[in-house]
């Protein structure tokens, strides 16, 4: 069942974030990524598989230097943008990652686009405001 798979994937993700299991983090992340990939394939019109893959790969690349989470945040965002009732916090997380990714890559124009999207969703968002203030 997809729901059970999804919950098992989240269990692995949260185990990977627990400091008591840091030695097993790569194993938990690999398992979670595999499960969320299956969820994304089985339910392609739902953002959750890609969104959680993004979170997993963000843990694998904490400095965002490799952009491992980028394709999954983009995929989740493309699904979410088709849904008028999309959860704002999820939209903000996707756009924040992508804004930061492009900032790290020194593509400031692209970075600004994502930070501005956040301000359209949440005009009081301090992170987006600070990020835009830091881009020349």
Regions of interest found by a model, annotated:
Residues 38-39, 76, 118:
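Canonical positions in the second alpha-helix
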Residues 46, 91, 124-125:
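Residue-level recognition of tetratricopeptide repeat
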Residues 1-5:
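Conserved small/polar residues in nucleotide/adenosyl-binding loops
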Residues 15, 26, 60-63, 105:
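Structural motif corresponding to the intra-repeat A-B loop/turn of tetratricopeptide repeats
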């Amino acid at each position: 069942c997809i729901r059970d798979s999804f919950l098992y994937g989240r269990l692995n993700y949260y185990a990977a974030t627990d400091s008591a299991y840091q030695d097993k983090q790569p194993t938990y992340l690999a398992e979670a990524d595999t499960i969320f990939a299956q969820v994304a394939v089985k339910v392609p019109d739902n953002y959750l598989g890609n969104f959680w893959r993004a979170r997993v790969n963000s843990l694998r690349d904490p400095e965002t230097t490799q952009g491992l989470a980028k394709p999954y945040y983009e995929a989740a965002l493309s699904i979410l943008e088709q849904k008028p009732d999309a959860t704002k916090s999820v939209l903000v997380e996707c756009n924040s990652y992508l804004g930061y990714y492009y900032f790290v890559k020194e593509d400031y124009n692209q970075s600004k686009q994502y930070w501005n999207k956040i301000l359209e969703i949440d005009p009081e968002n301090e992170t987006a405001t600070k990020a835009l203030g830091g881009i020349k």
